[in-house]
Amino acid sequence: MKLSVIIPVYNEFESIQVILKRVQETNLVHEIIVVDDGSKDGTRDVLAALDGKNGVRVILHERNKGKGAAVRTGMAAAVGDVLLIQDADLEYDPRDYQQLLEPINEGLAEVVYGSRFLGRAHRVTMFWHMVANRMLTFFTNILYNTILTDMETGYKVFRREILNGMTLHANSFDFEPEFTAKILKRHFRIFEVPITFNPRDYNQGKKIKLHDAFEAVWTLIKYRFVE
């Protein structure tokens, strides 16, 4: 199995070298595709020095297009037969890779989500973000007749072939609901595993806002009845 890790990046000067080191230390990765989404804080200078070393491939967006656009760019460039999405902000711990990959390696699932709500150790998160995550997951379960615990998780791992015939349009944080909706409509098996989680707050650079939840609701409804 060849694992491609896709890391969308926007203004992560303080964390990018740390997360790359943590990913490399897993010794599970064939390639690391870093998509810089128009960073303005010096992140690009760091990436320029790392490109082509230790499995790192850097792709640059000339302007900020959004997380979803960066993930889609990474997916198109990946050569592995299993793809894993890794945020650059240190909220998600690559030491969970082994557990995330196990259901795929054992043939139990084509898609694995790392759930922040299944009991592993985690730093206390912001209350209203937790409520929004729970409500969006509940809404997903109603619309798509499933029993997920964490639709909005950043840790999504999947076999490359599930992308065959799937067109993704999301440019922003609506990637999570669009991807989930299209996976569930195609009846792929999703396996959830518990992960550790160390959430940032806005002072530390957290980018997602509560208004993104309203866009997620619309995305879930839209793709329930189209495509």
Regions from the PLM with identified roles:
Residues 63-77, 82, 94-173, 199-221, ...:
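Acceptor/aglycone-binding surface of glycosyltransferases and processive sugar-polymer synthases
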Residues 2-4, 31, 178:
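Cell-envelope/extracellular polymer assembly enzymes that use nucleotide-activated donors
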Residues 3-12, 19, 26, 35:
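A conserved hydrophobic helix/loop-capping motif in glycosyltransferases and polysaccharide synthases
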Residues 30-33, 44-77:
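Conserved donor nucleotide-binding strand/loop of the catalytic core
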Residues 36-45, 90:
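A conserved acidic beta->alpha catalytic loop
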Residues 20, 24, 29-39, 59-61:
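Short beta-strand/loop segment that forms part of the nucleotide-sugar
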Residues 14-18, 41-50:
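Acidic helix N-cap motif at the loop->helix transition within catalytic regions
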